[in-house]
A protein has these predicted regions:
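Basic, helix-initiating cap at the start of DNA-binding domains
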Residues: 1-26, 30-31
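Solvent-exposed, amphipathic alpha-helical segments
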Residues: 12-23, 64-75, 151, 155-163
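Helix-turn-helix
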Residues: 22-52, 56
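Alpha-helical DNA-contacting segments of helix-turn-helix folds
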Residues: 47, 53-64, 102-104, 113, ...
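Hydrophobic alpha-helical connector segments
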Residues: 56, 70-96
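Amphipathic alpha-helical segments used for helix-helix packing
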Residues: 88-115, 119, 126-127, 195-196
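Amphipathic alpha-helical packing segments from all-alpha helical-bundle domains
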Residues: 109-158
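C-terminal peripheral helix-coil segments that are non-catalytic and often amphipathic
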Residues: 130, 165-209
Length: 209
């Protein structure tokens, strides 16, 4: 089989598992190959097990999420609000219980989900520091975020567990943000950012319907 055909077949398998993930269904070799319209044995020519294809599929989804966030949030003002919206989006992205279960069993991918959003967040924070109209944001706020994000990362796995228990994304997000004032804003400003980020996300979702 030539290289181009192999790549096409592998892409069909990955597309199939991504479709299954998107629908909140449980992936199996049988369901993946059936969705891809390929023979059962074809799967094992490209992937040694379900973990391997899940790993690659999640990798693709994470990359696309990072690109989408950078594109979709660039016009949100002020810049710190983008960081809040990003956390909401990353939590909501994994609300499917099968994917959440897999991620909790493979914490390396949780690390990846966290790390992929950080370069964007850091650029937005730098923008906020240099924004002369955003007088409430200082280097001290930025430094606080750099310190507290380790706590956020640690709490991210807990957030996924709460989703697995059936808790709504908005409630999981609100609890996380309430526990960690990410920029050490005054309480009323922090709450305003939480409310505005939820409103933005919900409006963006409704526009997709």
């Amino acid at each position: 089989m030539n290289t181009k055909k192999r790549q096409k077949t592998k892409a069909k398998l990955l597309k199939a598992v991504r479709s299954i993930i998107a629908k909140g269904q449980k992936a199996s070799v049988s369901s993946i190959t059936k969705k891809a319209n390929l023979a059962y044995g074809t799967f094992y020519r490209y992937f040694k097990d379900l973990d391997e294809i899940y790993y690659e599929a999640i990798e693709e989804l994470l990359f696309e999420l990072a690109v989408k966030l950078e594109r979709d949030l660039k016009n949100i003002y002020p810049a710190p609000l983008r960081v809040y919206v990003t956390w909401f989006t990353v939590i909501d992205f994994y609300k499917d219980k099968n994917t959440v279960t897999w991620l909790l069993e493979h914490p390396g991918k949780i690390n990846k989900a966290f790390l992929d959003t950080q370069p964007m967040s850091e650029a937005w924070i730098e923008e906020a520091i240099n924004d002369s109209e955003l007088t409430c944001f200082t280097k001290e706020n930025a430094e606080h975020y750099m310190k507290v994000r380790t706590y956020l990362f640690w709490m991210y796995a807990n957030a996924l567990q709460e989703i697995l228990k059936g808790k709504e994304t908005v409630d999981v997000y609100t609890d996380l943000m309430s526990a960690a004032n990410i920029f050490n804003f005054p309480k009323n400003i922090h709450q305003t950012y939480i409310n505005n980020s939820i409103r933005y996300f919900e409006e963006a979702q409704s526009n997709l319907l």
